[in-house]
């Protein structure tokens, strides 16, 4: 094990990064105060919220591809239910699981949401779902292998798992180093290289169907915020804090000059970041990736 960033160590065998020491469950709960989730139904400032929803819902045709009419779909860590709402609009039976009521505020009423700190305690029957989505959640969990094993159990034979994570072996991660926005310490307990994630899925009874390296919602912003973090001239992750829709009491305490500089670098940086996102997609090294896997049998 070698140190890579504050509180983060990297396994020299598998390449996975993890917090050391691991926080206790009580400490983990403290990483997610109510304001982390934003106001009910929203997480970002209004114009960003509309953009996030627009881009996110463009993925729904991908998520619903090849599903039979009325198929049961589970979103692990469903949050505000953006994915579930769009899938419900397409006639699917949607389910979600979250760690707290605060996390799921604003979720679509058509979704059956279960509140459980661990997926294994949510009480789903074996083979119940045709598809399970775990979108930028696996890295937050203290037992990722156990969660993947539980997903395998509750999927029907031939059922599909779609999992998205930051790619710890990506060009963006290597260039950014400890300044990488997608590290998100200490909330991300694990950092997965793509090849290690695929190996984990294969070892738990899945076959890899496809991998995808392009994310307009995640990857360009990661370039901009990571570059600002590297410069150390502005608050760490300050741009994200500026765009986040927190309560008034919890708003980022930036003065006018700092806010203007953050907005300036957002406007200037996005075009180059989009180009870099295209490049990392071409070389199959997306800053965030999603993998489609199928349960054998």
Question: What role is predicted for each listed range?
Answer:
Residues 1-135, 144-149, 213-214, 238-239, ...:
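Conserved N-terminal segment of class I S-adenosyl-L-methionine
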Residues 1-3, 215-297:
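A C-terminal cap/extension of S-adenosyl-L-methionine-dependent methyltransferases
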Residues 94, 161-162:
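A short hydrophobic/small-residue beta-strand
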Residues 135-142, 164:
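Short catalytic micro-motifs in class I SAM-dependent methyltransferases
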Residues 163-191, 195-202, 214-218, 223-225:
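Short, glycine-/aromatic-enriched active-site segment of Class I SAM-dependent methyltransferases
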Residues 37-47, 176-185, 225-231:
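Short glycine/proline- and charge-enriched loop/turn segments
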Residues 145-160:
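A short glycine-rich, Lys/Arg-flanked "PGG" loop and its adjoining helix->strand segment in the class I
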């Amino acid at each position: 094990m070698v140190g890579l960033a504050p509180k983060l160590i990297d396994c020299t065998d598998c390449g996975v990064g993890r917090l050391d020491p691991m926080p206790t469950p009580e400490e983990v709960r403290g990483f997610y105060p109510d304001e982390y989730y934003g106001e009910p139904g929203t997480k970002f400032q209004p114009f960003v919220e509309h953009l996030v929803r627009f881009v996110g819902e463009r993925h729904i045709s991908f998520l619903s591809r090849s599903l039979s009419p009325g198929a049961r779909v589970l979103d692990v860590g469903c949050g505000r239910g953006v994915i579930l709402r769009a899938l419900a609009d397409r006639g699917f039976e949607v389910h979600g699981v979250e760690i707290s009521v605060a996390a799921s505020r604003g979720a679509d009423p058509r979704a059956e949401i279960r509140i459980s700190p661990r997926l294994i305690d949510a009480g789903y029957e074996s083979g119940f779902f045709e598809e399970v989505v775990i979108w930028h959640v696996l890295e937050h969990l203290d037992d990722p292998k156990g969660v993947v094993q539980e997903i395998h159990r509750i999927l029907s034979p031939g059922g599909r798992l779609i999992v998205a994570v930051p790619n710890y072996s990506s060009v963006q991660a290597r260039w950014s180093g400890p300044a990488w926005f997608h590290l998100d310490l200490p909330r991300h307990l694990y950092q997965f290289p793509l090849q290690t994630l695929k190996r984990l899925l294969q070892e738990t009874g899945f076959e890899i169907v496809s991998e995808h390296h392009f994310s307009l919602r995640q990857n360009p912003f990661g370039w901009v915020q990571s570059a600002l973090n590297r410069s150390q001239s502005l608050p760490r992750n300050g741009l994200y804090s500026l765009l986040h829709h927190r309560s008034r009491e919890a708003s980022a305490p930036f003065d006018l000059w700092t806010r203007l500089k953050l907005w300036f670098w957002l406007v200037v940086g996005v075009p180059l970041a989009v180009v870099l996102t295209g490049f990392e997609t071409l070389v199959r090294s997306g800053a965030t990736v999603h993998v489609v896997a199928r349960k054998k049998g």
